Amino acid sequence: IYISGAFGKFILGGDDGVNDIIPPAPNDLISEEMYYTSKDGTADADHFLGIKNGDMANLAGNDNKITYMLPAMGGLSAGVSHTNKSAAGDADTTELGASYTMDAGGASIMIGGVTGTTENSTQDIDSQQIGVQISTGNATVVLAQSEYEADGDDEQGTSAGISFKVSDAMTLGAFTSEVEDDLSSEEYTNTGAEIQYTIASGLKAIINVEDYDYKAGTSGGFSDNGTASKLTIKATF
């Protein structure tokens, strides 16, 4: 649900907050990214890692929240999100973000950043991200850096992605990411590629291949590496 006007835009509900709306991220260029890990105890299973790329952690998930976006001011965009997790307020999440878009040398450049905090009884959970997006012709490149801090976590992530529209029917994408936890010595790297192909109007095939490596460090998890692939068929009506 949203309400918009000269005052800006209010968004209510379980949608993502400004962490997903504002800053550019390499994930935005890939339609069906997996960031795969296969064994128990790795980054997906027990969440030993709060981030797996250069994108900010989605601290509030799909919980109900209110987001306010300021009215457009030239190339500037800014907003705030708040998630009221409990009546006591001991697990609320607040996010602030801003971005600026400009033209330079025939390219469109966007620079954006976001920061968020979830209140916690032991140590607040904090995550930040800054990203740069450059678009020219049929190509778009995004570079991003993120951080995640919580009780027992001090993580830094970087990622880069590129998307190229070959034709009206085909788009190619690729990305690479790396995350390190200074406290547990965990490391996660992932490099992937994607092909999007429009078979017919409303019907699209998407092929993804990713190569990943997870080092558990002292986290108590299981180190893991491998290659994952996926075929997705999307139909829209």
Language model feature labels by segment:
Residues I1-F237:
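Outer-membrane beta-barrel proteins
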